[in-house]
């Protein structure tokens, strides 16, 4: 675990809070959740949605996307300055699904962004409530992480698609703030930095002038965020080198890719938060639950309890398996896309299978899909146990891993051995140990070589019964390590396209 000296807890990042005690943090996170809930209730009223339609996850996604778009200032400004055919920069909308005469119908709605902003602020006591917006972004990001494998994006930046366990938060928008930065994986940060360096290589003016100064500040800030995720001195020292480079170029890209690979064994600290769709918070608020008074945490038992008592529905395409659709959303809700499947299965109480074996496509329905054959079903989002979400990468050791994904990034603080395929990973480290970072590289490679399989991560941490709210009696599960643990194993998941 990185030291907690100057760091704020996630919940503080989540609510832009200064230092608060646990009760205050729980209250401010609760306030954020109830704001989302109140907004959702109001939108369902505006759109005249029935209770069932309001609990449909596709409707929830459209409503969430509308409010995020209404508050996306940079894009709104861009749209006004570059008017494109048939797109009104002042309006936002999307598909809303209603049940008409025993069939699901798609209705495209359009609203003034100003009106959406008004409803959102009203639900949040007049505030912009950016924390709530970021929360929804992280939920969308977690859903993307579970649904898509970022092979193409990885290959484009010169990284290995098998490093997908480092890509948490790769679709988060830049404006997602400190809370967003906390949940980004090492690979995501590396990819953002490489894109930046490549622009600098291709565009002479990228680092120059007033704009270039801003660019440089952003570059150094991103380097510091990434540095803060690493848990070993050598990795951090190498990040200092990358950050201080006068003119970032191919040498820095090499260093970053080296660091990303090293993170498969010497894992970084990446935060995990359970962010649920707005259609979970809405009905809870409507039923009279006072999140602010009761308090709420994104990393404890609260999201599990909430899902335990929630009814969420989803549209299902003709050849999809509703149980598989449920697994996809369960993983997204618990931020578990890169967790060891054996751990997820134990906590969920039903087997969690790799992405390639799921008979389901993403949750969103494209505008050209035929609605006549659409059914809907209940998503099973309950769990057998609960566990605390981690923000450390755990310590490092070795197990069998797979062709498609050669390491994992833990979500739950549960005692276990962490799987990774050492031979495959180490094979990438042959040769190139010269240059100015050679001593650090040698040190990092040595640490990776010495990573022991028998070391246990999260000593003594276990899972808890749902009745054990105080986490008093940990159950330390034993896992069958002969089974496959990677989700994106030899995978055929769809690609994420903006």
Curated annotation (Swiss-Prot):
Keywords: Capsid protein, Helical capsid protein, Host nucleus, Host-virus interaction, Ribonucleoprotein, RNA-binding, Viral nucleoprotein, Viral penetration into host nucleus, Virion, Virus entry into host cell. Residues 1-21 are annotated as: Disordered. Pfam families: Flu_NP (PF00506). A motif (Bipartite nuclear localization signal) lies at residues 198-216. Late in virus-infected cells, may be cleaved from a 56-kDa protein to a 53-kDa protein by a cellular caspase. This cleavage might be a marker for the onset of apoptosis in infected cells or have a specific function in virus host interaction. A motif (Unconventional nuclear localization signal) lies at residues 1-18. Its main location: virion. Coiled coil: none annotated. GO terms for cellular component: helical viral capsid; host cell; host cell nucleus; ribonucleoprotein complex; viral nucleocapsid. Residues 8-21 have a biased composition (Basic and acidic residues). One of its GO terms (biological process) is viral penetration into host nucleus. It is found in: Virion; Host nucleus. It comes from the Viruses. One of its GO terms (molecular function) is RNA binding. Encapsidates the negative strand viral RNA, protecting it from nucleases. The encapsidated genomic RNA is termed the ribonucleoprotein (RNP) and serves as template for transcription and replication. The RNP needs to be localized in the host nucleus to start an infectious cycle, but is too large to diffuse through the nuclear pore complex. NP comprises at least 2 nuclear localization signals that are responsible for the active RNP import into the nucleus through cellular importin alpha/beta pathway. Homomultimerizes to form the nucleocapsid. May bind host exportin-1/XPO1. Binds to viral genomic RNA. Protein-RNA contacts are mediated by a combination of electrostatic interactions between positively charged residues and the phosphate backbone and planar interactions between aromatic side chains and bases. This is Nucleoprotein. It comes from Influenza A virus (strain A/Hickox/1940 H1N1). The lineage of its organism: Viruses, Riboviria, Orthornavirae, Negarnaviricota, Polyploviricotina.
């Amino acid at each position: 675990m990185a030291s907690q000296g100057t760091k704020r807890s996630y919940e503080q990042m989540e609510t832009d809070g200064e230092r608060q005690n646990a009760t205050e943090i729980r209250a401010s996170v609760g306030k954020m959740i109830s704001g989302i809930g109140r907004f959702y209730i109001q939108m369902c009223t505006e759109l005249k949605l029935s209770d069932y339609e309001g609990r449909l996850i596709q409707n929830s996604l459209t409503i969430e996307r509308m409010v995020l778009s209404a508050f996306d200032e940079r894009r709104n400004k861009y749209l006004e300055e570059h008017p494109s055919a048939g797109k009104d920069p002042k309006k936002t909308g999307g598909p809303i699904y209603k049940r008409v005469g025993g069939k699901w119908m798609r209705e495209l709605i359009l609203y003034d962004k100003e009106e959406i902003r008004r409803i959102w602020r009203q639900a949040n006591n007049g505030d912009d409530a950016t924390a709530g917006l970021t929360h929804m972004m992280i939920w969308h990001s977690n859903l993307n992480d579970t649904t898509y494998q970022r092979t193409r994006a990885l290959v484009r930046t010169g990284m290995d698609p098998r490093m997908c366990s480092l890509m948490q938060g790769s679709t988060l928008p830049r404006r997602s703030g400190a809370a967003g930065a906390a949940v980004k994986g090492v690979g995501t940060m590396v990819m953002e930095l490489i894109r930046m360096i490549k622009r600098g290589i291709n565009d002479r003016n990228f680092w120059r002038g007033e704009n270039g100064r801003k660019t440089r500040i952003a570059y150094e800030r991103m380097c510091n965020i990434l540095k803060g995720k690493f848990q070993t001195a050598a990795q951090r020292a190498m990040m200092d080198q990358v950050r201080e480079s006068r003119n970032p170029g191919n040498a820095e890209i090499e260093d970053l890719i080296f660091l990303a690979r090293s993170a498969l064994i010497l894992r970084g600290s990446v935060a995990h938060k359970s962010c649920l769709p707005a259609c979970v918070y809405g009905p809870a608020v409507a039923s009279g639950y006072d999140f602010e008074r009761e308090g709420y945490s994104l990393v404890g038992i609260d999201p599990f309890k909430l899902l335990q008592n929630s009814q969420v529905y989803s549209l299902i395409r003709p050849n999809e398996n509703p149980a598989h659709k449920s697994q996809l959303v369960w993983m997204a809700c618990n931020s578990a896309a890169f967790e060891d499947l054996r751990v997820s299965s134990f906590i969920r109480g039903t087997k969690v299978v790799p992405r390639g074996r799921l008979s389901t496509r993403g949750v969103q329905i494209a505008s050209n899909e035929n609605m006549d054959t659409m059914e809907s079903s209940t998503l099973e989002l309950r769990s057998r146990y609960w566990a605390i979400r981690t923000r450390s990468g755990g310590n490092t050791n070795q197990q069998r891993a797979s062709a498609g994904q050669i390491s994992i990034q833990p979500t739950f603080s549960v005692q276990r051995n962490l799987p990774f395929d050492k031979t495959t990973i180490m094979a990438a480290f042959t040769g190139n140990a010269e240059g100015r970072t050679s001593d650090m590289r040698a040190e990092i490679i040595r640490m990776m070589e010495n990573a022991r399989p028998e070391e246990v991560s999260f000593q003594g941490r276990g899972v808890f019964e749902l009745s054990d709210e105080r986490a008093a009696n940990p159950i330390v599960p034993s896992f069958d390590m002969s089974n496959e643990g990677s989700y994106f194993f030899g995978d055929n998941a769809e690609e994420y396209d903006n």
